[in-house]
């Protein structure tokens, strides 16, 4: 996200100022005008679209159950039922665990989710394939795997407060240019070892 933001800023001819916050506070920062937009793999949802505007999607992913490699009990999404999952409170992935009647162990972030799975304190965590690809890129010897993957594609985009039409229009134009030039694919391959900038 940082590299995509820098590429966008360069394309737009502006300087970017990063504000690092916890996931659960990201969107709240938009509400309080702490920053102009959020670029942190925010999934486009009907609920969020009621209150916010989104750029065109810049990454695509799928929900995935991430477990230890030796876990043989969880092989499909419905296997969530009756198992413990580490999840951040406001993520879309917590809703998946609730839907399949799994038990949620609340955490603050992805790193904590992974840590609890690695320690065997939970059976797994549900997140997107992007998070797992990034984990493997940073930690190739990880003891975790994708045990099951959902079929619903998730589109991630930059998120803005409604009414920032000029900013949205310019960001969309810049994203299209970065896609066309191959820059988004290049960044994607660098961090995920696969191109997630297209469906």
Protein language model features and the residues they cover:
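Bilobed "Venus flytrap"/periplasmic-binding protein-like clamshell domains
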Residues: 1-10, 62-110, 114, 129-133
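Acidic, polar ligand-binding/catalytic clefts
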Residues: 2, 6, 10, 15-79
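Extended ligand-binding regions for polar small-molecule ligands
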Residues: 2-11, 71, 89-91, 155-194
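Alpha-to-beta junction loops
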Residues: 13-15, 31-40, 84, 118-131, ...
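Short helix-initiation/N-cap motifs at beta->coil->alpha
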Residues: 17-28, 72, 90, 105-119, ...
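A ligand-binding cleft/hinge motif common to bilobed small-molecule-binding domains
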Residues: 25, 42-50, 96-99, 123-153
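Periplasmic-binding protein-like
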Residues: 60-67, 133-176, 194-199
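Ligand-binding clefts/hinges and TM-proximal coupling segments of bilobed small-molecule sensing domains
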Residues: 92-107, 143-148, 173-199
């Amino acid at each position: 996200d940082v590299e995509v933001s820098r590429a966008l800023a360069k394309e737009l001819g502006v300087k970017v100022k990063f504000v690092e916050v916890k996931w659960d506070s990201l969107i709240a920062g938009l509400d309080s005008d702490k920053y102009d937009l959020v670029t942190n793999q925010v999934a486009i949802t009907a609920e969020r679209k009621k209150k916010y505007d989104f750029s065109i999607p810049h990454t695509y992913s799928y929900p995935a159950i991430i477990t230890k490699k030796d876990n043989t009990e969880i092989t499909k999404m419905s296997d969530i039922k009756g198992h413990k999952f580490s999840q951040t409170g406001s993520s879309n992935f917590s809703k998946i665990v609730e839907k399949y009647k799994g038990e949620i162990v609340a955490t603050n972030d992805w790193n904590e989710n992974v840590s609890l799975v690695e320690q065997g304190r939970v059976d797994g965590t549900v997140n997107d394939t992007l998070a797992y690809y990034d984990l493997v890129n940073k930690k190739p010897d990880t003891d975790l795997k994708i045990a099951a993957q959902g079929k619903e594609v998730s589109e991630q985009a930059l998120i803005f407060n409604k009414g920032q039409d000029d900013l949205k229009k310019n960001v969309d134009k810049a994203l299209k240019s970065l896609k066309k030039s191959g820059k988004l694919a290049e960044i994607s391959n660098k961090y995920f070892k696969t191109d997630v900038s297209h469906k």
